[in-house]
Amino acid sequence: MQKYIITDIDGVVLDWEEGFSVWMEHHGHEKVEGYQFQYNIGDRYGMTYEQGSKLVKQFNESAAIGFLPPLRDAQYYVKLLHEKHRYKFVALTSLSLDPYAKALRERNLKKLMGDAFERVICLDTGADKNDALKELASKKKYENAWWIEDKPENLHAGVKVGFKGIMMEHGHNMNTSVNGFVAKNWEDIYNLITQDLKTEPYKR
């Protein structure tokens, strides 16, 4: 039986923050003090929620979105889970409905992760994932799949429909109580999924 890992992309597989930070700096925007503990982009840059959301959408639909680096140790362990343990990945990302943005995302993942991703599902920029997760959970092929996220609300939505949840830790979510495991990096995720618990991720 084929094994699946369903995962968010930005802040889990790819380092969206790094790419966005460089892009914002290029456009003359500076972060506020303590930005790393803020999830909302407006709060990070001292602007309104609407202004922040508009810039996120603009960035997500720019050419820059096709050149994001891997997050932490994602490249090594995603490929290892796919090539050694035969897991297939499904991306569920609130990137954009723009078809060119999706094509750039697929190309970015292919370049870094090879053939690990079987499918890339793009939702509207910043959209919640409840309905998409319910739809995936209704398909027998994804039964018992892992679900990896960095946004607690989305993690809980996946756990609620039956997926096994892992949250990637960041400054903005480190004090949040979650119904699932918390990983600091992909080595933690790899060890948990393969039950090689040398550095067991903690549950909170």
PLM feature spans:
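Active-site neighborhood of HAD-like aspartate-dependent phosphohydrolases
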Residues: 1-52
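Anion (oxyanion) recognition and catalysis
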Residues: 25, 82-83, 159
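Metal-dependent phosphoesterase signature
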Residues: 30-31, 39-79, 85
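Substrate-recognition element of Asp-dependent hydrolases with the DxDx(T/V) motif
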Residues: 65-70, 74-109
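A generic structural motif
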Residues: 81-89, 117, 143, 163
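Substrate-recognition "cap/lid" segment bordering the active-site pocket of phosphatases
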Residues: 94-145
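Short acidic-hydrophobic, aromatic-tinged amphipathic segments that line or gate anion-handling sites
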Residues: 120-124, 180-188, 192
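Acidic, Mg2+-coordinating phosphoryl-transfer loop and its flanking beta/alpha structural elements
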Residues: 142-184
